[in-house]
């Protein structure tokens, strides 16, 4: 049996690498869509910033693995052989499920998937244990940490609603202040806006990212908690003064600083806190094997109470995992497809091919929203409506230019609101999914920005409903698939484990090595979302430097400026006047 468990551990190690690949392919949308959608920098520059954030987060990660070890079930009630089957079922189900979502281009929560897979597999193991012992099946609740699952479900509901409303409200207020012709407002209050934005991003970086890092001492964390208000005010004041100097003296585009800093912080926090969920299960299996070897007991008699002890992943292992994540960012086509879904649903472009079709719930929501808009328009005075509509009047499209999905203002709002919500939930120890927050903030900001017009609203809402339904399907399918795999291994033994293991690897290889054109290369439309440098150069060639704001240096470096963004982020006027 020892050789069997060694083979199982080797398989779990291979699956861990694959899980990193498919997991990062889905989670990359959390920290890449804002920078890529507004083309604040080239695709390569954005990836380099995200890659550095991922490696830094992996290096400083504490690597705490409580979720995989004891966060979902009570390990002291299971034997070594039972938990090895649970860990095997979880990893097989996880890679298959995440790869399916990646193939569909739908973002989902990797945290929710791993938690409910652990729950489903542990539930199946507990049932087999109770049946063999002749105990009542109602005792299965003693084996599962049910409060964790309720916390995750409540986190899903809360994060979806709060993130959408927050993104919509903040973006609406920001657009009222800046408008689409934001160059004048940028010179007046850009420094204050930048101070608020970067303060929120740094606060998020500390609360969500660095606070759990291995180098953070307990006394440092206590000092930060005791002096949070003073730290935030000092940061805001200092950054505002710095940005005012950069804007007035050096003519620096601070939107680039804000958006790239937000991209780095989200990538850092992702690697620092979420990395271990991809490798936590194989490492928990490895720790279980070492304890079993040291005990000398039979595999079906040794109870795994040792998993209740806190454990951290080795830094070298986390850093190696970080390199795998970076390679995924650069080379995964499915990551690009998931990012494309998020950008398409929040894009200001209209009249183009929509990714999702219309649905009956989408039509009902649109009709209800239009009716509510008519009621509001009758309440608000017409002069106020005209004043608000003038603030939301988009720039006309210049012939020959390709409109961006969204501009710098909306991209920065997406990052700021996401950072504030995630950091606040982390400080309050509330369950929250970063995927749900970042996606719904982007949807709320696009709704408030008028990106969903009469032509595209029903398609965009149908797409959002598809993604949200996929989130709830994640929990059900994850627990069910892991339970089925566990049941098959309990019944079929070693032969079933070997067949399922090789079957999972075959499906993944077949899915990721397709030769069809739409799976190997990006379409022309999606490629235009990413290639900022070539777009900037082509814009400069079409217009004179004086008109386009492109100097010879900018033509060579494709370095975006605020003036250039005003000409490059244009979209068609709406078919109807804007009402609040």
Language-model segment annotations:
Residues 152-248, 257-261, 316-332, 347-354, ...:
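Core mid-bundle transmembrane helix pairs that form the ion/substrate translocation pathway
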């Amino acid at each position: 049996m020892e050789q069997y468990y060694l083979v199982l551990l080797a398989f779990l190690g291979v699956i861990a690498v694959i899980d990193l690949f498919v997991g990062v392919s889905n989670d990359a949308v959390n920290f890449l869509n804002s920078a890529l959608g507004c083309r604040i920098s080239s695709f390569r520059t954005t990836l380099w910033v995200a890659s550095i954030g991922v490696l830094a987060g992996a290096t400083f990660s504490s690597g705490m693995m409580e979720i995989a070890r004891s966060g979902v079930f009570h390990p002291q009630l299971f034997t070594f052989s039972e938990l090895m089957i649970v860990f095997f079922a979880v990893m097989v189900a996880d890679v298959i499920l995440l790869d399916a979502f990646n193939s569909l281009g739908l973002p989902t929560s990797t945290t929710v998937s791993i938690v409910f897979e652990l729950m489903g597999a542990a539930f199946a193991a507990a049932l087999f244990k109770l049946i063999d012992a002749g105990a009542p099946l109602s005792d299965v609740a003693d084996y599962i940490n049910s409060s964790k699952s309720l916390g995750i479900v409540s986190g899903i509901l809360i994060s979806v609603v709060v993130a959408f409303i927050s993104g919509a409200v903040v973006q609406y207020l920001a657009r009222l202040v800046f408008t689409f012709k934001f160059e004048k407002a940028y010179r007046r209050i850009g420094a204050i806006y930048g101070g608020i934005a970067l303060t929120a991003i740094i606060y998020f970086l500390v609360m969500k990212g660095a606070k759990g890092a291995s180098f953070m001492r307990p006394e440092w964390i206590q000092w930060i908690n005791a002096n949070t208000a003073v730290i935030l005010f000092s940061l805001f004041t200092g950054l505002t003064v710095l940005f005012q100097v950069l804007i007035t003296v050096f003519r620096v585009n601070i939107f680039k600083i804000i958006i790239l800093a937000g991209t780095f912080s989200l990538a850092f926090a992702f690697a620092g806190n979420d990395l271990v969920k991809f490798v936590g299960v194989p490492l928990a299996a490895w720790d279980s094997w070492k304890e079993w070897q040291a005990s000398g007991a039979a595999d079906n008699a040794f109870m795994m109470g040792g998993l209740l002890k806190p454990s951290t992943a080795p830094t070298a292992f986390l850093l190696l995992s970080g390199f795998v994540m970076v390679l995924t960012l650069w080379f995964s086509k499915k990551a690009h497809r998931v990012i494309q879904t998020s950008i398409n649903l929040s894009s200001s472009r209209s009249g183009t091919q929509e990714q999702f079709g219309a649905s009956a719930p989408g039509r009902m929501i649109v009709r209800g929203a239009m009716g509510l808009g008519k009621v509001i328009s009758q309440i608000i005075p017409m002069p106020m409506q005209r004043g608000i509509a003038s603030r939301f009047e988009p720039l006309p499209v210049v012939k020959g230019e390709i409109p961006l999905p969204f501009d710098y203002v909306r991209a920065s709002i997406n990052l700021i609101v996401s950072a504030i919500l995630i950091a606040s939930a982390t400080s309050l120890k509330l369950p929250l999914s970063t995927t749900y927050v970042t996606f719904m903030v982007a949807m709320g900001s696009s709704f408030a920005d008028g990106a969903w017009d009469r032509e595209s609203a029903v398609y965009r809402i149908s797409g959002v409903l598809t993604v949200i339904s996929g989130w709830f399907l994640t929990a059900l399918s994850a627990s069910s698939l892991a339970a089925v795999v566990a049941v098959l291994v309990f019944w079929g033994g070693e032969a079933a484990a070997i067949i399922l293991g090789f079957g999972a690897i075959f499906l993944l290889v077949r899915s990721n090595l397709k030769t069809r054109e739409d799976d190997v290369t990006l379409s022309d439309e999606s490629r235009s979302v990413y290639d900022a440098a070539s777009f900037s150069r082509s814009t400069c060639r079409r217009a004179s430097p004086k008109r386009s704001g492109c100097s010879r240096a900018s033509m060579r470096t494709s370095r975006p400026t605020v003036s250039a963004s005003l000409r490059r982020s244009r979209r068609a006027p709406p078919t109807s006047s804007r009402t609040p």
